[in-house]
Amino acid sequence: MAKYGLYKTFPDLWLQECPAEWEAVKIKYLFSERSEKGYPNEPLLVSSQNIGVVPKEVFGNRTVEASKDLHLLKLVQIGDFVISLRSFQGGLEYAYYRGIISPAYTILVPGEKIDGGYFRYLAKSVRFIELLQMCVTGIREGQNIDYMKLKNHLIPVPSLEEQKKIAQYLDWQVSKINRLIEAKKKEIVRLTELKKTVVNEAVTHGLNPNVPMKFSGVEWLGNIPAHWTTIKLRQILHPFSEKNHPELPLLSVVREQGVIIRNVEDKESNHNFIPDDLSGYKMVKKGQFAMNKMKAWQGSYGISNYTGIVSPAYFIFDVDFENLEYFHYAIRSKVYVNFFAQASDGIRVGQWDLSINKMKEIPFIVPPEDEQNAIVEYIPVAFAKYDEAITTLTEEVDILHELRNKLISDVVTGQIDVRDIEVPDFEYVEETEDESDDDSDEDGVTVDEEV
């Protein structure tokens, strides 16, 4: 693609060079800071690295409950930019809505010399994020961007007309890439659902389609093999609670994977608060069953392959069942997710508190031991073809993300000249936010409920 005719360097600019006709201006001369409070009736906003600053209900249920002191939150207007606690990892966030947000965030209002559309892309470019990382203060969980440092840095500033053209061009090109990404992500979702169907069919009907069937006793479950038995979960799961093991690794219980080791160094996936004192966290031993009781209705539970500690709000059980691998597959199937949903009571959006008494009465279907073993051997083989396709699609999505990021970075830093490119009419396509599969220890749960 075409480059500009002449380039120049600025001594204090973080870019090697930019087009000769562009300016380099300090951020503090392009933006003013908004710090208005006292708007408790405005909608609550959250800052997402993928979809910008949006209402809490748009983002979902992945954030901690807001403070009651809503009058202390900062006002955000449409078109503002927000420096959040994780902006040093993913850039500044553009506000698509008016509302209120954490007072810990810095709100920037674009001035007359900067176009919001242009800066929205510049603020997400790889090179700008590198600049943000130079302005970080604090360590680990306490890291944040020091705006007093950031505002004195230069950024490249084309003419206002050219900024608008760059934003228009990138909207067009990014939409084309996002359309491809969305198609691949949709196929990944379809294949993932097919994998769930494989498990669901195996643990409710077995592998032999010709065996006699009987009514399960549950209307929406239908028939099960006549020679299978049904017991209650209270016969299998026995409550366990042990604390004071802060030296053990921190674990998470997530919907798609069950119990995993939590990466405490990854600030992006650890937006939930991790206390300094972990002595109150519950121990989970390898082979035990751990459950996020607020997210059981989504499937956030499973047999642990690790010994570690989890949120004190979780349920932990010893498991009286010989084939733990079969139990793990079965209990995480769609059938049992539905049972747990029925045994939970909604307390707020996205959070349903599981009743331990109702849970104990959930039926569990038990095939003979040889059939359990056969099902455990069958499922990974059946998964293989889906997993291969999902891996390929995921790699293709990653490549498209890299292509999109490079294009944005090249255009907003003047490595590509788009001034003479005619942009046709197009439909803008945003990449949708992936559903969260994170551990939600802090989703308003502060009571240590023992079972």
Please place each PLM-identified region on the residue numbering.
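A short glycine-rich beta-alpha junction/loop motif
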Residues: 7-10, 85-86, 99-106, 139-164, ...
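Short, ligand-facing micro-motifs at secondary-structure edges
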Residues: 40-62, 81-106, 117-121, 130-135, ...
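Amphipathic alpha-helical coiled-coil/heptad-repeat segments
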Residues: 1-17, 21, 158-211, 366-451
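Sequence-specific dsDNA recognition surfaces
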Residues: 9-12, 25-78, 234-286, 432, ...
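Ligand-binding loop in jelly-roll beta-barrel domains
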Residues: 110-115, 319-323
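Non-catalytic DNA-recognition/assembly elements of restriction-modification systems
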Residues: 4-39, 160, 164, 215-246, ...
